[in-house]
Amino acid sequence: ILCSYIDNIIAKRKVTKLTSDFVICDRWVNDILIDLGAECRINNILESKWYDRFHTIIPSNTFQFIVIRNIDDILNCRVENNTNPDFQYRFDLYNKLASKSNVHVIDNTGSIENSVMQILRIIE
């Protein structure tokens, strides 16, 4: 965990030097924690000191999104998840993350255009 934490601190320093208005990271702090929680079966990872510490890395003006989909759609789209022993645990952790007040939930059951519009409404 400590190595991932340090790696993310370095990544944050790189991001803060950029001059663009938005930086989009597909996988970052929450994904690292959920991967760790799923692989090590740490059910309370999102309520842990590590969650709090990792979130100190995130700049204060950051929007955090979680894109949700129906579990059957995910399993049909990525068949490897059907045999992944961590999948259900990871899926449950993402659902827990979606209930956090600092996370914006994007419903991805419709078109990609619909998902993009949901994000734009939040950041504008």
Regions found by a protein language model. Name each.
Residues 72-124:
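NTP-dependent small-molecule kinase module
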Residues 1-41, 45:
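ATP-dependent small-molecule kinase phosphotransfer cores
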Residues 19-20, 61, 101:
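Short, well-ordered alpha-helix to beta-strand connector turns
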Residues 25-31, 47-50, 57-77:
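Conserved phosphate-donor/acceptor-positioning beta-strand/loop module used by diverse small-molecule
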Residues 9-12, 50-54, 91-92:
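A generic local structural motif
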Residues 43-46, 70, 111-112:
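Alpha-helix capping and helix-coil boundary motifs
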Residues 39-49, 79-85:
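Short, surface-exposed loop/helix-turn segments at secondary-structure junctions
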Residues 15, 56-57:
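Structural motif
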